[in-house]
Amino acid sequence: MSGALKTPFYDLHKRLGGKLVNYANYLLPISYPSQTHIESHLHVRSKAGIFDVSHMLQHRLVGAEASKFLESLVPTDIGAVKPGSCHLSTFLNDKGGVVDDTIITKVGENEIYFVSNGATSDKISAYITAALNEFQNGSHGLKYDNFKKSLVAIQGPTAHLHLSKALKTDLSKIFFGNHFFLENGEKVI
């Protein structure tokens, strides 16, 4: 595991006794001493679970042609997606084959946030950059960046109750496929 990177939650995983393995060149927990794999799975399916996904590559695309550009890479009609909505999609190669999957969030008419797999960060980054250079040809003014920051996934039928309490925020109007962002502890929609 030498050389593997640590997420911002590494110390917490260690303190909680997480069994860490190298995944996508990050030290991530696959289990904790309080539950077996099956117990953990059943707990998430019946209640809730939280996962450190900080190893995943996050992307931000801003500009008037953001939807048009992303539509050249995925089979999703981004223009028809309402701001505030999220969609599971796939990046496609020139022949229509799947390069990787992604979750796309339309933040606003001219801003798109999406997340791709951590294990394919270099491949996806190069794929998007090459496509953007070809698309832009110096005339579209799109701004693109990708980054790895703290990111957690909270799943399960009672996840919203726990998250509402922790954030002191009413999540009753945030339904499946909707989003909100927290920046410096403040809710940004």
Spans of model-derived segments:
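Glycine/proline-enriched, intrinsically flexible loops and inter-domain linkers
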Residues: 1-189
